[in-house]
């Protein structure tokens, strides 16, 4: 009887240890994997040329409309970006399409895609 009691105790200990091992295997990874990033998507914007004084560079004003978080009023915000214009084709007042690109200089990260509308 003593032998059975000892083996029974060992069996419960080993079962408890096995359950503990099984519980650790059922847990997920130690860290949460990051979601996959969308590849090949560059930002495109439409804006108006405000300066063409630099060589192969234009300054374009981008307009964004944002709703005020508390009052709900639509607010117009503008941002000026420097854009690479290889052929110096755009002039002041032109409506242009831009695309994000790799850094071309200290401040240039956009390139001219096309001139949508010439200034009058």
From Swiss-Prot:
Choose one Gene Ontology CC annotation of this protein and give it. cytosolic small ribosomal subunit
CDD domains attached here? Ribosomal_uS17
Q: Which InterPro entries match?
A: NA-bd_OB-fold, Ribosomal_uS17, Ribosomal_uS17_bact/chlr, Ribosomal_uS17_CS
**Stretches that traverse the bilayer:** none
Q: Which UniProt keywords apply?
A: Ribonucleoprotein, Ribosomal protein, RNA-binding, rRNA-binding
MF-aspect GO terms: rRNA binding; structural constituent of ribosome
Output the Pfam families linked to this UniProt entry.
Ribosomal_S17
Q: Does the keyword S-adenosyl-L-methionine apply?
A: no
UniProt-listed NCBIfam families: PRK05610.1 (NF004123), uS17_bact (TIGR03635)
Q: How does it assemble?
A: Part of the 30S ribosomal subunit.
The protein's role, per its UniProt record? One of the primary rRNA binding proteins, it binds specifically to the 5'-end of 16S ribosomal RNA.
- Protein family membership: Belongs to the universal ribosomal protein uS17 family.
What name does UniProt use for this protein? Small ribosomal subunit protein uS17
- Organism, per UniProt? Mycobacterium ulcerans (strain Agy99)
- What are the leading ranks of the lineage? Bacteria, Bacillati, Actinomycetota, Actinomycetes, Mycobacteriales
* Gene that specifies this protein: rpsQ
């Amino acid at each position: 009887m003593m032998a059975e009691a000892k083996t029974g105790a060992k069996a419960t200990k080993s079962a408890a240890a096995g359950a503990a091992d099984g519980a650790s295997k059922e847990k997920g990874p130690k860290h949460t994997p990051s979601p996959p990033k969308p590849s090949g998507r560059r930002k495109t914007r439409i804006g108006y040329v405000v300066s063409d004084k630099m060589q192969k560079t234009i300054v374009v004003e981008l307009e964004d409309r944002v709703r005020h978080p508390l009052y709900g009023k639509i607010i117009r915000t503008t941002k000026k970006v420097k854009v690479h214009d290889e052929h110096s084709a755009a002039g002041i007042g032109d409506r242009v399409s831009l695309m994000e690109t790799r850094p071309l200089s200290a401040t240039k990260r956009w390139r001219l895609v096309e001139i949508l509308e010439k200034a009058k």
